[in-house]
């Protein structure tokens, strides 16, 4: 009887260790994902508002993966800042799809890591001028955002046919 009781207590203790040790990282990753999703919601709001606050969500060493035709492997925050400010001067942006953020995973471990992914649709418009009519185009994109432990965006990639959208607006 004493041996059975010891075995049962040992099994319960082992199960508790497994349960609590497995539950903590998932809970931590879930909390990081929720916090990072809120950051991305604000990033999108700042982008639509053409606000310099947009850039404050990124670490100074943040990079974007070059995903366009013949794009460089990485694009720095400084380069993106110049490009986005020029684009804001020329175009208006509106997120027209719901923000259904998806949890990302670590590429090596495949474990949920707090990164944020999603499929979004943006309306990009160009105002009329004396010689042109107003135009707009909808572009569907896949975007991902990886964060450092301080909640700053470190890595971003955007896949979508943005070049075709801009070409249409500028023709």
Q: For each predicted feature, which ranges?
A:
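Bacterial Sec-dependent N-terminal signal peptides
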Residues: 1-34
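Short, ordered coil/turn segments that flank beta-strands lining enzyme active or ligand-binding pockets
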Residues: 20, 60, 149
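Short, low-complexity N-terminal intrinsically disordered segments enriched in polar/charged residues
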Residues: 22-52
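Mature soluble domains of exported/periplasmic/lumenal proteins and thiol-rich metal-chelating peptides
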Residues: 47, 57, 64-65, 70, ...
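A solvent-exposed, acidic/Ser-Thr-rich amphipathic alpha-helical stretch
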Residues: 52-116
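Short beta-strand segments enriched in hydrophobic/aromatic residues
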Residues: 58, 120-124, 160
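Exposed beta-sheet edge and beta->alpha loop/turn motif
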Residues: 117-150
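Low-complexity, intrinsically disordered terminal/linker segments enriched in charged
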Residues: 152-171
